[in-house]
Amino acid sequence: MSEEDDHWNLVRLRRLRKGREGEEQSSKSEISLDSLHESSFAGEDDEDFDADVLSNTSSEESAQMNRIYDFRTSNEFSNAGVNIDQTGVPTISESFDTLSGSNVGGTVLPSMEGSKLKDSTIRNSSTLSDHIIDKSEGKSAKLKMWHVIMLSSLLSMTFSYLALEYSLTGDVLAGFKSQQSLRNNERKLLYGNIDFVDKKSYDSSSDSLSQWAPSGKYYVDFDNHIAYPLKDDDLMGWRRYKTDLVILWYTTKARMKDGWHKRINKINGGRIKLHLFLKNSFKSAQESLRVLHKEQKRRWKRLFVLLHNKYRQFSPHIKRYFDHSCQKAKQCWSGSRLQLRKLRFKSMKPFRVFQFKVRKDTNWFVKQLKRFGLKLQHSRMYKAMSECRKKNYFKCKH
């Protein structure tokens, strides 16, 4: 044995028990080395006899190489007994990790080193794997339902995303050009939602303000959309406290501004609602008045047409009656004038009934009548009656 192979590990083997209860069969092991024999380890009658055997494999390698290689036939399987472990893990005496071979079914198998059993087991395992591969190749690939569902959902999601991208940007591949599109878009779309404090100190007079972009460390309040710049030496001590105070001031101002804007919007909303209410009420009142005016106009028009028709129907009779009354009045007036002219006023005695005296001066009475006639002649009524008389005279003449 060379100096490289002189490293040995001590392996403890436990005796294998087979057969009925109480019956024990000692495991015999033979060491292929000339200097070691079985007699040095066997010969003790204790049930729990443990033998220390030298092996050229470590315990870890022994556990990894411990595989089941059973070459018994079906009859030997039936006669072997029921004490074999059902988990499929072989005992140490049945494995090929010992120097003397394996003890299976009462027969000692030679060692795996340099034997043909190793080649036969490898050949059998290769044939078994070929058989499994042939069975797997014989099965036809079937498309299952969940495959169809997954493919259809992926296709629908892709189509909807492309349609949405096209409707928003007009370009189907706009989402895949994010890096270039972000550089080309306006800076306001990127940083317009955040109030950067150091942006005010930037040179706002030049046109480069539109190209401004934040850089460095910022203390950001995402609730109020405020960002305050921080340097590397401003994170501790008084400057950090100052930064917190500035952030608190901007946060409070933003909240007050937000609350004020909300209140103003609420007031403006109430005022707009009141204005709309008054406007709608005025429009409704105006519409109702317009409808009422149309109805009243229609009614008065009907009444006027009715009165006009009645007037045209009764106007000849009224005209005749008026003419007849005018003629009678003229006749009465002319007759009264004649009677007044022919009247001879005699001395009138006082009426005893009324106990008052009437003047005996007849000339004064005549003067009063003449004066009354002159007044009547120059009155409007007399002029109207004279005009009617002239018209009637001309009508009768013609």
Curated annotation (Swiss-Prot):
Consequences of knocking out this gene: Partially blocks reticulophagy, and the double ATG39/ATG40 knockout almost completely blocks this pathway. Leads to abnormal morphology in the nucleus/pnER, when exposed to prolonged nitrogen starvation.
Motif residue range(s): ATG8-binding: 8-11
GO CC terms in record: endoplasmic reticulum membrane; nuclear outer membrane; perinuclear endoplasmic reticulum; phagophore assembly site membrane
Annotated compartments: Endoplasmic reticulum membrane; Preautophagosomal structure membrane
Presence of keyword Oxidoreductase: no
Transmembrane segments: 148-164
Gene Ontology BP, a term: reticulophagy
Keyword terms, alphabetized: Autophagy, Endoplasmic reticulum, Membrane, Transmembrane, Transmembrane helix
GO molecular function: protein-macromolecule adaptor activity
Motif ATG11-binding in this chain: 52-59
Topology within the bilayer: Single-pass membrane protein
Region of interest (Disordered), residue spans: 15-50
Primary location: endoplasmic reticulum
Induction: Expression is increased by rapamycin, which mimics nitrogen starvation by inactivating the TORC1 complex.
Record keyword Membrane present: yes
Record function comment: Acts as a receptor for reticulophagy and nucleophagy. Directs autophagic sequestration of double-membrane vesicles derived from the nuclear envelope and perinuclear endoplasmic reticulum (pnER) into autophagosomes. Is not required for the cytoplasm-to-vacuole targeting pathway, mitophagy, pexophagy, and non-selective autophagy.
Self-association and partners: Interacts with ATG8 and ATG11.
Protein name stated in the entry: Autophagy-related protein 39
Species whose genome carries this gene: Saccharomyces cerevisiae (strain ATCC 204508 / S288c)
Lineage: Eukaryota, Fungi, Dikarya, Ascomycota, Saccharomycotina
Encoding gene (name): ATG39
